[in-house]
Amino acid sequence: MVKLWRRYIPFINAGIQELISYRVNFILYRIGDVMGAFVAFYLWKAVFDSSQEPLIQGFSMADITLYIIMSFVTNLLTRSDSSFMIGDEVKDGSIIMRLLRPVHFAASYLFTELGSKWLIFISVALPFLSVIVLMKILSGQWIVEVLGLTTLYLFSLTLAYLINFFFNICFGFSAFVFKNLWGSNLLKNSLIAFMSGSLIPLAFFPKIVSDILSFLPFSSLIYTPVMIIVGKYDASQILQALLLQFFWLIVMVGLSQLIWKRVQSFITIQGG
């Protein structure tokens, strides 16, 4: 374990340093995310103001507000840029340096992202989560229940990130065949934002659409962890959701290994 840690700690440090080096870029993107969250809030406020009912699909305005906030936080922590990194490295030829290192190909990207995710969690997610937990407790909710849901949220969040990471690894492997993934990456991210419940909770879709989207792996990325922390899932629903996340994680890991074996024959180096 110590040997493994020493092998991958440079990648963790690289992820931290990259985030620090491009902090202005990171801040500007987050400002854009916050503006998007405000737009979503006022759109939902208009919907509830025009409705005669205090609840829509079981959500109050307070629930939707919490959903929007936690969707923003969850998206920060589950987002993976591994497909972009693979695409860029294949395009400029630097992928050969990663392939020559005595480390697992996918694990090198994983530990690089974990470095930046840890910094994001400490600086952004933890303050948000602490305030929400405190507000829930002050509102009269049982402390044990709040802490339990928070723990389950963090566990589900970890599974969500790993699912998204290995999905992006699978997608990134197509760069060995198509060489340029920039446009397809943008399309992929837009579709995932829709299907993950990041923009609209899946409960608001027609039942058959909601059932299909809820089974797909993308609902595990945002919708599942957010519904847990918002308190919209009971114990049996939480168990089913976590088991589904485990299922998709196993599928994505297995699929990444299978695709990696197939695409190695397509490796050609571009660049200088």
Give, region by region, the residue ranges found by the protein language model:
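Hydrophobic transmembrane alpha-helices and immediately adjacent juxtamembrane helices
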Residues: 1-272
